[in-house]
Amino acid sequence: MGSGYAKKKKEAKIMEQQFLEMEASLEKKRYEGQAGNGLVSVVINGKCDIVSVKVQPTCLDPEEPEVIEDLFRSAFKEAKTAMDQEMSVMRAGLPF
């Protein structure tokens, strides 16, 4: 095994380190989505974990629970779209 193998091994180690650093930074990133003019707000991190949910009491109607369900889905989708857009930019700079 010549220097080519050692070089590839070193490159793999560097890529692994970059991946671990990126993964750690994802937990710190925050993406917010809102629906219903701010009635519902969802914040997720870069790993798509929900960090917080805020619901304005004015949209809580026990007669129509599907309203809050729809608002939550919309807010989450907005946050995820923002995250996906940033992730695609980040991935563009990766060698793999």
Curated annotation (Swiss-Prot):
<comment type="function">
    <text>Binds to DNA and alters its conformation. May be involved in regulation of gene expression, nucleoid organization and DNA protection.</text>
</comment>
<keyword id="KW-0238">DNA-binding</keyword>
<protein>
    <recommendedName>
        <fullName>Nucleoid-associated protein CF0672</fullName>
    </recommendedName>
</protein>
<comment type="subunit">
    <text>Homodimer.</text>
</comment>
<keyword id="KW-0963">Cytoplasm</keyword>
<dbReference type="GO" id="GO:0005829">
    <property type="term" value="C:cytosol"/>
</dbReference>
<dbReference type="InterPro" id="IPR004401">
    <property type="entry name" value="YbaB/EbfC"/>
</dbReference>
<comment type="similarity">
    <text>Belongs to the YbaB/EbfC family.</text>
</comment>
<dbReference type="InterPro" id="IPR036894">
    <property type="entry name" value="YbaB-like_sf"/>
</dbReference>
<dbReference type="GO" id="GO:0043590">
    <property type="term" value="C:bacterial nucleoid"/>
</dbReference>
<dbReference type="Pfam" id="PF02575">
    <property type="entry name" value="YbaB_DNA_bd"/>
</dbReference>
<dbReference type="GO" id="GO:0003677">
    <property type="term" value="F:DNA binding"/>
</dbReference>
